[in-house]
Amino acid sequence: MASRQAPLCGLAPCCLWLLGVVLLMNASARPANHSSARERAGNREENEILPPDHLNGVKLEMDGHLNKDFHQEVFLGKDMDDFEEDAEPRKSRRKLMVIFSKVDLNTDRRISAKEMQKWIMQKTAEHFQEAVAESRAHFRAVDPDGDGHVSWDEYKVKFLATKGHNEREVAEKIKNKWDLNIDEETQEVLENLKDRWYQADNPPPDLLLTESEFLSFLHPEHSRGMLQFMVKEIIRDLDQDGDKKLSLSEFISLPVGTVENQQGQDVDDSWVRDRKREFEELIDANHDGIVTMAELEDYMDPMNEFSALNEAKQMIAIADENQNHYLEPEEVLKYSEFFTGSKLVDYARSVHEEF
């Protein structure tokens, strides 16, 4: 698989090769994902070497759920942490209006779809740069001899060490091809990781990853081949009839069983509504009711300019109360929760304060 040196031209999410993720019940049972990216965390050692289950600026999570934070990630970029729920409202409103001014390239006090598209691409590029920097640091953690290559055995030793195994003992067992005595769940995760390792290994395969290949291993959105592999895994997980395509009913499948209370019913209703809108408005490009691998790949490619434009139009439509196809300061402030994750009160009055 060739590593992508330049951003893909063809967006922005997947699969069961994730670390630590339990297999889903079956393709028709997809529970809603209630946690946001801000709430996800693992132990530090695992975070240094394991592929993340959340990719900033990618529409789908690695388990096939919609990325709940996507709009904030591509609108706020590195400023996302500044808009926490307990932030001082006036300060947050001012920051939001500063961002508005940056997106508004022609300074006409309204944001067009083209302006939003350019902003989305800029913020996505920032996430790409962050991923490269993080991957470089993590590569050093798994390349103990500093030879610029990481073997599968070297990685396996580090991985098992994060699971509580003695690093020296594991290395000795692997060297002598002795039984590692690991539990079934850990073995399954290792097999999934090895499959992913093979996919990131540029031909001719040697099970040695360079720094750029290791980036593709951790962040499949940086590699065309890994992105395609990711798409195949998603379709495999969701495809119920085996046609290697996704129908609307397959994409919005709910967990098996009856909800126990109204809150659970509301969650299910929200799951169906959000995924139906995403399927019909953004993923199914030719609107034939079927999503192909090519359509899902375009949707998941973070640097696909056409998908970024569609996303920009959808983001504007959500807050465009006067339906003029532009975003105005009042609308951005009123729908601040959508753009920032925080609800900022007194939005109308603050427009005059901040401008």
UniProtKB/Swiss-Prot annotation:
InterPro entries from the UniProt entry: CAB45_EFh (IPR027240), EF-hand-dom_pair (IPR011992), EF_Hand_1_Ca_BS (IPR018247), EF_hand_dom (IPR002048)
Phosphothreonine: residues bearing it: T186, T210, T258, T292
Keyword Calcium: yes
Compartment annotation: Golgi apparatus lumen
Biological process (GO), any one: calcium-ion regulated exocytosis
Region (Necessary for intracellular retention in Golgi apparatus lumen): 302-355
GO annotation, cellular component aspect: endoplasmic reticulum; Golgi lumen
Domain EF-hand: 91-126, 130-165, 226-261, 271-306, 307-342
TM region(s), chain numbering: none
Residues that bind Ca(2+) 1: D104, N106, D108, R110, E115
Name this polypeptide is given: 45 kDa calcium-binding protein
Organism name: Bos taurus
Taxonomic path: Eukaryota, Metazoa, Chordata, Craniata, Vertebrata
